[in-house]
Amino acid sequence: MTTGVRGDNAPDPSLLAQLTQNANSASAASTGKNGQVAGAKQENVDASFEDLLQDAQGTGGSKKATANQTSKSGKSEKAQASSGTSTTTSVAQASQTATAQAVHGARDSGFNSDGSATLPSPTGTEVNGVVLRKGMGTLALMGLIMTLLAQASAKSWSSSFQQQNQAIQNQVAMAPEIGNAIRTQANHQAQATELQAQQSLISGITNIVGFAVSVGGGILSASKSLGGLKSAAFTNETASATTSATSSLAKTATSALDDVAGTATAVGAKATSGAASAASSAATKLTQNMAESASKTLSQTASKSAGGLFGQALNTPSWSEKVSRGMNVVKTQGTRAAKFAGRALSSAMNISQMVHGLTAGIDGIVGGVIGAQVAQEQRMAGMAEARAEELKSLNSVQAQYASQAQQLQEQSQQSFNSALQTLQSISDSALQTTASMFN
């Protein structure tokens, strides 16, 4: 390259200074992410440099006087350009740091439609199982943050609720077992009562059967006793008839004796009527007086003894045998009467025992029926008690679930408030960061 005045290829110092300044400004503008724009600017700088060279060829000798000064100033400008280039390199390296990238990223993100700053997209795509999509807005990120906080709170609650749920499940599982135990106890009590009722019923039936047997035996004994009474009555009637016949015979004998005595007296009177001696008369009178005395005595005796069995027996022939037979009859009848009295007493005792057996039988049968009813009531009472215990257990479980739900609600409210506070803090921090970047 020549100047046109001197004909040499030495450059113009002023032009070199101008080009150096343009290069410095171009290198300063080329920092950051827009490398293509910086390259385009560099090309523009080169094009302007060539234009300046072409313009410099036409200037000629107007610049000849200042050539030495320009040469000196060009050397100083070269030194400054080298120092500017090193400064530009250090600035470019500083632009690659994380802080610079964050600042440029925030500047490049722009704003939302409502004027708030748009948060940068996260580098990861999943956090604790929650998928993060690119291009999510601020509200979506806040919702995800709240979800993550809720999940963290749920994990912290699960450890405390697991023990409570285990206890509740054990209580729910034990409720039917308690009910079954109460039902079993009630069934055993009812079975014991039923056995007692069956025993009482069997005892009652046995007593009734014994009463029937005793009644049958009593009827047979009474029949035999009535037969004995009829025999005794027949014997008594026979004795009365015999006494009447004996009395009639005694009267007949007395009448016969009187007739004989009268006939003898008449015969004696007729026989001695013709005797003349005083001895015969005296004997006849004596005989008559004796006959009259005997007749009176017999008549009086017969009339006095006609009303009793003993007098009649004495006035009858073989009265001692008759008296002996009468005593035997009395003895026999007395023995029979004693036996009958013993039988009557025994029958009375048997009747008392039979009545007692009948009462015990009725009591046993009624007790058996009532015992069966009591057993049924005991079984029903056991069922009701078992159901009541199960309902108590279920009520306790429901109360525990209600308490657990209340605790969960309170803790959820606390977690929600904590999440809101966290989001508020994040929002305030984002606003402060945005304000600091743009101010």
Swiss-Prot record:
Residues 110-126 have a biased composition (Polar residues). InterPro entries: BipB-like_C. Residues 1-127 are annotated as: Disordered. Disulfide bonds: none annotated. Residues 79-102 have a biased composition (Low complexity). It comes from the Bacteria. It holds the Pfam family SseC. Belongs to the chlamydial CPn_0808/CT_579/TC_0868 family. This is Protein CT_579. It comes from Chlamydia trachomatis serovar D (strain ATCC VR-885 / DSM 19411 / UW-3/Cx). The lineage of its organism: Bacteria, Pseudomonadati, Chlamydiota, Chlamydiia, Chlamydiales.
